[in-house]
Amino acid sequence: MQVTTRFISAIVSFCLFASFTLAENSARATPGSDLLVLTEKKFKSFIESHPLVLVEFFAPWCLHSQILRPHLEEAASILKEHNVPVVQIDCEANSMVCLQQTINTYPTLKIFKNGRIFDGQVYRGVKITDEITQYMIQLYEASVIYLNSEDEIQPYLENATLPVVINRGLTGLNETYQEVALDLAEDYVFLSLLDSEDKSLSIHLPNTTEPILFDGNVDSLVGNSVALTQWLKVVILPYFTDIEPDLFPKYISSNLPLAYFFYTSEEELEDYTDLFTQLGKENRGQINFIALNSTMFPHHVRFLNMREQFPLFAIHNMINNLKYGLPQLPEEEYAKLEKPQPLDRDMIVQLVKDYREGTAKPIVKSEEIPKEQKSNVYKIVGKTHDDIVHDDDKDVLVKYYATWCIHSKRFAPIYEEIANVLASDESVRDKILIAEVDSGANDILSFPVTGYPTIALYPAGNNSKPIIFNKIRNLEDVFEFIKESGTHHIDGQAIYDKLHQAKDSEVSTEDTVHDEL
């Protein structure tokens, strides 16, 4: 009996010890600490109401999350004094928000700026209190450096490795300037001289002596962080340059149309440089101009809907994905050329002018029209899209996908099942069409797509406009979307349930017969 009592006592002691250990090592914030715990419902509103937030996405069972917790609690207490909240999201209990934030490892720390929930920056520094607090304080307080005199500016210019932006006395711009500085603190240095009588906004590039002044209406920037950001990103780019890989992302992030000149030799590049530099200067802030070596980047022209015939000039609007180019030769004629055919300079200038005026005609890419449809998911191509989606009698559901997109691949079998279910019911077969289009192989000018897969429903009727599906891509939600948004209000879920009840009944009958045998 004594042994039993000791044994039980040991077990109880062990359990108590284990409980205290687990409590000590819990990844969740200690009640009463400055480390806040958020849920999916509160996440969006919290981020949108704070200019700077550090968020930990964690899993309760994760040892690394448990180790990080005390460091975050200390950091939260320090950062609270600087009005920078530190919060937690438990990914086990809030899986949807973690999925939306593409959280793949635990713990993941993300920095959210200016209330944007889908633009979080992953913190890649050391995950200890001092490093975290130092980084966040510097990000918040040093995003704009306030100076008292012109003499204090010079050291920043002499030692600059990043573009230096200077706000001289434009106090009305302060709030917008601070917001943009917070966003771009890792790419620019922002200085502010509040008492200056100069009243100007300028940017100094490293290793240059002449500043670039903002020569527009400053009032157009006040309260308009997008416009200020756009100016900063565009003005640092040359009028025309032979592109380097590390510079290309800056052109992409400017969101301006990109004009490409593919050259075949250094002599050819030199011959056209003055023309394109002048065009770049005349169209600053409207079109960016770059050169590409056709030997190094021959296949890039495929993304411009053009053939590999060099030299070549084309314009790509990356917002709506429309492409414009000079006329090209038939393949047979191009193959007979003994040397590159020069581009017509007047035609280059005219294409740029027509593009700016909105009269240039885009190059439309389309697969060939299928001779037969091989499944219940109807294949649409660029040439047939508009005729098919605007149907007097049918609701038309269209999936715009990309072959390289993992989300498109995951959704494909679900979409196929939706089509099969609706095709199984004769009463709705003529009232709805389930279709898809490969956006990488077909240009749809009437409906530019920027994310994949995009699901849109065109209700029956000639003048119907697409209704975008924005819920979880599963069977139930898509059926509900069709029912609520379509002209015919087809209840796909009811058809699905009826179909599976019939199958279950067949299986039950077969089992009964088998048992009787």
Swiss-Prot record:
* Glycan-carrying positions: 159, 174, 207, 293, 462
Q: Does the keyword Cell inner membrane apply?
A: no
Location in the cell reads: Endoplasmic reticulum lumen
According to its UniProt record, the EC number is 5.3.4.1
Q: Which SUPFAM superfamilies match?
A: Thioredoxin-like (SSF52833)
User: What happens after mutating residue 408 to C?
Assistant: Increases PDI activity
Record keywords: Endoplasmic reticulum, Glycoprotein, Isomerase, Redox-active center, Repeat, Signal
Primary location = endoplasmic reticulum
Per the record, what is one GO cellular component?
Answer: endoplasmic reticulum
At which positions is motif Prevents secretion from ER?
514-517
Please cite one Gene Ontology biological process associated with this protein.
protein folding
Catalytic activity line of the entry: Catalyzes the rearrangement of -S-S- bonds in proteins
- Please list which residues make up the signal peptide: 1-29
What does its PTM field state? May have O-linked mannose residues.
Protein function: Probably interacts with nascent polypeptides in the endoplasmic reticulum. It is an essential gene only in the absence of PDI. Its native disulfide isomerase activity is very low.
Listed under subunit, the entry gives: Interacts with EPS1.
NCBIfam families annotated for this entry?
A: ER_PDI_fam
The record's comment on protein family reads: Belongs to the protein disulfide isomerase family.
Task: Tell me the protein's name.
Answer: Protein disulfide-isomerase EUG1
**Source species:** Saccharomyces cerevisiae (strain ATCC 204508 / S288c)
